[in-house]
């Protein structure tokens, strides 16, 4: 799934759980649906969902403001609403930029304290 540029769907997530965890396809589907429902329910209640090493989903309240119709330039009131925000963790940011958590690029080996320098 990684690096292909495709959109990952619920079906893809269920298949990954099936392949990697070993649950049946029915159990894998139920598991994915349960996790997504729990995240959704928490967000509906206004709770922050923090997934370690991944990121945080939170609901933010936006007050009423004045917007502008781009075609006519007419001012239009935009009603107050709640919006969902995702803030990726530092670890996720590093991974999508090809770095490991220690700041090294993926594929680089960490320096060994036992390596001998030759001169």
Swiss-Prot record:
GO terms for cellular component: cytosol. SMART domains: BHL (SM00411). Residues 96-119 are annotated as: Disordered. Transmembrane segments: none annotated. This protein is one of the two subunits of integration host factor, a specific DNA-binding protein that functions in genetic recombination as well as in transcriptional and translational control. Heterodimer of an alpha and a beta chain. This is Integration host factor subunit alpha. The lineage of its organism: Bacteria, Pseudomonadati, Pseudomonadota, Alphaproteobacteria, Hyphomicrobiales.
């Amino acid at each position: 799934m990684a690096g292909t540029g495709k959109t990952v769907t619920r079906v893809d997530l269920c298949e990954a759980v099936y392949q990697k965890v070993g649950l049946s396809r029915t159990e894998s589907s139920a598991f994915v649906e349960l996790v997504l429902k729990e995240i959704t329910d928490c967000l509906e209640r206004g709770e922050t969902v923090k997934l370690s090493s991944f990121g945080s989903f939170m609901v933010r309240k936006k007050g009423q403001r004045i917007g502008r119709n781009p075609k006519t330039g007419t001012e239009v009131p935009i009603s107050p609403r709640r919006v969902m925000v995702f803030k990726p963790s530092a670890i996720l940011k590093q991974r999508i930029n090809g770095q490991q958590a220690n700041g090294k690029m993926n594929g680089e080996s960490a320096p060994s304290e036992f390596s001998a320098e030759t001169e």
